[in-house]
């Protein structure tokens, strides 16, 4: 970071997150729990803090109570040293409207920029999963002479309608020649025709230039008051917009496999996929990089516990992330992420799923390819994620790709005989990880099969059922 530049960071955290419903029915999108112990906003804030930017304001609006509480309980800075992370809701300082867009959110909060009097303003989104050293981006911004710089990541061409698309100047690859927000199609890169440069929603501005642009935008009638749709094109048209290639960002402790990882988790399917990215032995995104930690609120729950259940059934978790306070009592968890204080009962199975805080899985229940929000109780013998039509009939959301989603505290009806039979048919199955490990060892494979039979028998299901 240039030592003679004062930097203020602004985190845009007012998003409603309609595409993440029902996970956002009771909270703002940046406040959605993620990866067992975190909330989505922790990634943006950790990246800023690790970049040594310690004057941060978080602009909130939509159902922000849990998000504001998380920030106040987790992100306590040393104000005696002039550092702070302040959650700032819409205040109607300019007119009587709430935030009308991301640019309007900053415009209505210009007092924060005036009070901090920075040279540089870093603006970031609050709902992406990645690691990034913003100091490296600021360094390029200052050296290039640009007034605005956009961080860019390569994406497949078929995703152009989901992002702001950047075309670079042919003579100066650090300069933006054109910027189009979510076009129906776009040409590919010269170096790789199958990809395009997408805006990451992270920006660096000269502070005075940003303030001027926001005033101009506020006076326009033909604007959506959007950072990507209106403010960045303003700088592009003036020839003052630069681009920062995310692949140049160098994070301590990163691997070739995860150093350019970036996920927009704005949909249920992408949110689910991001969790599945975490659980392999060599994950696409490594949560365990201690040189660039992702910070969050420390749990007061005790360590996780794996114990035998009824009938001497073995409690185990394979290829999974298990947070504090989890108790797996004779159940099997595979390829899943379990948040704090989850309980998994005797002979139950949780496969390829995401369970948030205090979810309870009853005896002999089966959960498959599901996301279950906080405080849901799954009764004994229930089957979730095995029959999409049955799930929809009970009021659960099922995505086109087959992910079943239960909202916070949603009631799960007691299973009927057909549902109990459906779950019972899955209790004998040997976990995929054990199948792979015992493939060439018949005796071990037979032993694993007997474990499955014992689990089923513990809840009164025979191998012939």
UniProtKB/Swiss-Prot annotation:
Involved pathway(s): Glycan biosynthesis; glycogen biosynthesis
Catalytic activity: alpha-D-glucose 1-phosphate + ATP + H(+) = ADP-alpha-D-glucose + diphosphate
CDD domains listed in its UniProt record: ADP_Glucose_PP, LbH_G1P_AT_C
A Pfam cross-reference name: NTP_transferase
GO molecular function, one term: ATP binding
InterPro entries assigned to the protein according to its UniProt record, in alphabetical order: ADP-Glc_PPase (IPR011831), ADP_Glu_pyroP_CS (IPR005836), GlgC_bac (IPR023049), GlmU/GlgC-like_hexapep (IPR056818), NTP_transferase_dom (IPR005835), Nucleotide-diphossugar_trans (IPR029044), Trimer_LpxA-like_sf (IPR011004)
Quaternary structure (record): Homotetramer.
Physiological role: Involved in the biosynthesis of ADP-glucose, a building block required for the elongation reactions to produce glycogen. Catalyzes the reaction between ATP and alpha-D-glucose 1-phosphate (G1P) to produce pyrophosphate and ADP-Glc.
Family: Belongs to the bacterial/plant glucose-1-phosphate adenylyltransferase family.
Protein's recorded name: Glucose-1-phosphate adenylyltransferase
Organism encoding this protein: Arthrobacter sp. (strain FB24)
């Amino acid at each position: 970071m240039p030592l003679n530049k004062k930097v203020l960071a602004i985190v845009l955290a007012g998003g409603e997150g309609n595409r993440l419903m029902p996970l956002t029915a009771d909270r703002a999108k940046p406040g959605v729990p993620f990866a067992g112990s975190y909330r989505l906003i922790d990634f943006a804030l950790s990246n800023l803090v690790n970049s040594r930017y310690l004057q941060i304001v978080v602009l909130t609006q939509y159902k922000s109570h849990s998000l504001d509480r998380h920030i106040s309980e987790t992100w306590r800075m040393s104000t005696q040293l002039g550092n702070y992370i302040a959650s700032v809701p819409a205040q109607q300082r300019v007119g009587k409207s709430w935030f009308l867009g991301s640019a309007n959110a900053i415009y209505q909060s210009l007092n924060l920029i005036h009070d901090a009097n920075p040279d540089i303003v870093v603006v970031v989104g609050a709902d992406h999963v990645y690691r990034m050293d913003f100091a490296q981006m600021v360094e390029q911004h200052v050296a290039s002479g640009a007034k605005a710089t956009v961080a860019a990541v390569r994406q497949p061409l078929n995703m152009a309608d989901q992002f702001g698309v950047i075309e670079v100047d042919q003579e100066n690859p650090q300069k933006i020649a054109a910027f189009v927000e979510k076009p129906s199609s776009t040409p590919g890169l010269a170096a790789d025709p199958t990809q395009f440069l997408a805006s990451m929603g992270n920006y660096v501005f000269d502070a005075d230039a940003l303030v001027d642009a926001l005033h101009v935008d506020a006076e326009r009638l033909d604007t959506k008051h959007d950072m990507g749709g209106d403010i960045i094109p303003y700088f592009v048209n003036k020839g003052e917009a630069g681009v920062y290639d995310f692949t140049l960002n160098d994070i301590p402790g990163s691997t070739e496999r995860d150093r350019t990882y970036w996920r927009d988790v704005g949909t249920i399917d992408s949110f689910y996929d991001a969790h599945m990215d975490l659980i392999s032995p060599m994950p696409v995104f490594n949560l365990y990089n201690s040189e660039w930690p992702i910070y969050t609120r420390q749990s007061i729950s005790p360590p996780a516990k794996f114990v035998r259940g009824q009938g001497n059934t073995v409690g185990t978790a394979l290829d999974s992330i298990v947070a504090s306070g989890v108790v797996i009592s004779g159940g099997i968890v595979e390829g899943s992420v379990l948040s704090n204080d989850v309980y998994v009962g005797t002979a139950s199975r949780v496969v390829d799923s995401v369970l948030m805080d205090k979810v309870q899985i009853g005896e002999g229940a089966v959960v498959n390819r599901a996301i279950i929000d906080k405080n849901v109780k799954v009764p004994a013998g229930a089957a979730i994620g095995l029959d999409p039509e049955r799930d929809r009939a009970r009021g659960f959301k099922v995505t086109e790709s087959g992910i079943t989603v239960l909202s916070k505290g949603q009631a799960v009806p007691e299973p009927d005989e057909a549902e109990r039979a459906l779950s019972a048919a899955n209790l004998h199955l040997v976990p995929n990880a054990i199948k792979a490990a015992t493939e060439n060892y018949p005796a071990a494979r037979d032993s694993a099969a007997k474990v499955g039979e014992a689990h089923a028998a513990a809840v009164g299901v025979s191998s012939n059922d």
